[in-house]
Every structure is written in structure tokens, then in C-alpha cells.
């Protein structure tokens, strides 16, 4: 199997990672899409061979690295793409492993104001009135918008984990591998954003059709008790709406967009505050 080039997509949920994957996959040289299981498989293998397990003395460092590289090779063996963008929110928390396994890899981190992330997830929840979605495991978490948003913001949950992992990566030793892409700029200026992404990953530019973008994963969404979680509308455009969150809940999360004012951070940023410079 010819060597593939690997890059990664991560960041916050409901912030354009599936949309970005749907756009990138228009390029016949690229493979991209919704979250893959690779990051979870890497974590599982590391857990199995780490100190405290009976396998730790049987698998040395070089063997571990070869096994983990083999996960990528095996998972993408039937994929003919030259360049793979593997998506998972966990990559920002495992960026050291990523850098060791794929020294030239870059990571595109999609972000969005956290208040609007919560708004989007709340809309998903309310869209299935007679379904207990997989987002919340018990009645106490599902009870109200207050308990739902608080649960999602926990450090080991959908929004909180991704947010904290991104903060860690932005000030880590591999921050120069990161490009932060604000959802609002992606949907309002997609051609410019994609051009910057191509420059960042060092690939020749490709002319994308932002009027005919498509992606859907109904089987995956159905197992979560949700509808359209990974459905991408054909046209990339701004869609304005009024929030359905109570004002106090919205205000609680609207101030958390730390990427708009990053100091001493080596990450490349395409964010709202500096949209004209894409600094």
C-alpha cells in the first residue's frame, strides 16, 4: 500500500468539522468525513500495554509505535486517497502521539462560540421529542436545559472535554501544528478558508464547489437517537437564527471563545476577531 499523508480534524462539536470534511472530500486525492475510531483505538492499545498491565513488559517502545501505525494502515487499507484527514475530537488531547506517529501531520481545529454550540445541541435534543437521546444517560441530566448544558460542559463530556483538550493543545509544544478555524468564517468565506488550509497542509489547491456539498450519516445518528446530526446542507452559507437558550444560559457560555484573543500561542488562527488578517 502506498504511503499516505495523514492530517487531522478536531476541535469543538457542532463547529463545522463534518462540513469541512464534506468539502475536502470533493478533492479526489483526499479522504475526510465524520469522526473515525482511530483515536479511540490508539487510546485502547496504549492502555493495554502501559505500566500496570500484564502486557507492559511484553511490548517495548518501538513495538508500540509500529502497532499504533498499523492501526492507521489497517483502517485505511481499502481507501485509495493519497491524503487522509482523520477526524476525532480526541486528537487535541493526543497530539503528542499524533506528532510521533505522523511527524509532518497538521491538525485543523474547528471552533464556534460555545453558546452557539450549546444552542445547536439543544436544538438536536428538542428535535426528537419522544426519544431519550444518547447524549444524556439519565433522567436527571435530561431534565431541563440547565441540567443538559451543565452535563455537556463537564470535563469528561461532549463539549467540556473538547474545549479543555483544545485549550491544552493551543499552549502545548505542538501548537505550531494547529490551525484554528472559526465556523462563522468557514461558512461566510469558504473559498478563502480552504485556500489557507491548503497552504497550511502543503497541498496543491483544488477548486471546490460550495454550492454542491453533501454528507449524511443517518445510521450513526439514529443509534444516538438523533436526526441529522451529521447531515450537511448542499450550499455553504450563513444561516442566521435566534437562540433557543435562556438568556442566562447563553450568557454563561458566550464568553468562552478564548481563541479570539490568544496570547503566546503558536497556532495559526482564522478567527472572528482577526478575520481580515486570518492571523
Where are these regions (language model features)?
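Glycine-rich phosphate-binding loop used to anchor ATP phosphates in small-molecule kinases
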Residues: 71-97
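PAPS-dependent sulfotransferase catalytic core
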Residues: 1-71, 78, 126-128, 220, ...
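PAPS-dependent sulfotransferases, especially Golgi type II membrane carbohydrate sulfotransferases
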Residues: 1-7, 152-155, 163, 167-173, ...
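Short catalytic/ligand-binding loop motif for oxyanion handling, primarily in non-cytosolic enzymes
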Residues: 18-21, 40-42, 92-95, 115-120, ...
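Short beta-strand segments
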Residues: 9-11, 84-87, 109-111, 180-182
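PAPS/PAP-binding and catalytic site of the sulfotransferase fold
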Residues: 16-30, 98-102, 180-205
